[in-house]
Structure formats: C-alpha cells, structure tokens
C-alpha cells in the first residue's frame, strides 16, 4: 500500500509544501494527501470517508483503531500503552528492520483474524511465514 493521508496537528504551510513535494517525488506517494493543522478527530473522519489498510501513529491512534477497525502500527512518540516501546530503534538499519517486522506482524495478525472459518477461509499460511 501507498500512503494516503499524512496528517500533523502542528503542521504548517511550509511543512505541507515540503511533504507534498517529497511524496510527489515517489510513484508510491503521488496519491497521498497532506493535512496540516488537523487533529485526531479530523483523521477519524478521514478514516471513515477514505479508509486505509493500516494506520501508523502513537498510542492515541488506538482510539481510531477501535472506532474504525483500521489496524494501528505504533511507531511514533508517545507510546504509553505498550511496555518498553520507547527503547526500540526507529532510525538506521535496526530501525528499518523493526519497521518492516512491525508492519508485517500487523498484516499477519489481521490475516489470522480474518481467516478463522474452518474450511472456508482458513488458508494454510499459519506455519509458513
């Protein structure tokens, strides 16, 4: 998936221009919309009107996950509702591995939840990941 919404409560017009340029420079970011000065309530509305597959954010995103059913990947500061997540790297090689692992684990968790019906949706991926 490509990014769809990039939102920052303290985002300025300069930030919006910079992010728009950055996203437009990649074929994967051309569809993204940049939203400066918007809060979680605005993001909640966006998730209902223009749904996405995954949400990357902090602990406050858990309420959006509950309301919209969009799986949350906790990567940003602050993370209050998970133990020792502040110690995990976000930058460099180790951070990249952690990001990849976290995203894949979230996708696998969702796949497991959505494929529980015996002989209907129970694909045999359980032990081959």
Task: Show where each model-derived region lies.
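An N-terminal assembly and electron-transfer interface module characteristic of large anaerobic redox
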Residues: 1-129
């Amino acid at each position: 998936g490509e990014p769809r919404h990039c939102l920052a409560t303290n985002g300025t017009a300069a930030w919006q221009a910079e992010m728009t340029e950055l996203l437009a420079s990649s074929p994967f970011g051309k569809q993204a919309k940049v939203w400066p000065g918007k809060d979680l309530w605005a993001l909640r509305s966006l998730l209902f009107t223009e749904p996405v597959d995954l949400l990357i954010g902090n602990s406050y995103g858990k309420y959006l996950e509950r309301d919209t059913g969009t799986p949350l990947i906790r990567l940003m500061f602050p993370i209050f509702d998970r133990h020792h997540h502040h110690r995990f790297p976000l930058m460099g090689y180790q951070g990249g591995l952690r990001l990849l692992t976290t995203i894949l684990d979230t996708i696998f968790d969702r796949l497991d939840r959505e494929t529980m019906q015996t002989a209907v949706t129970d694909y045999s991926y359980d032990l081959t990941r």
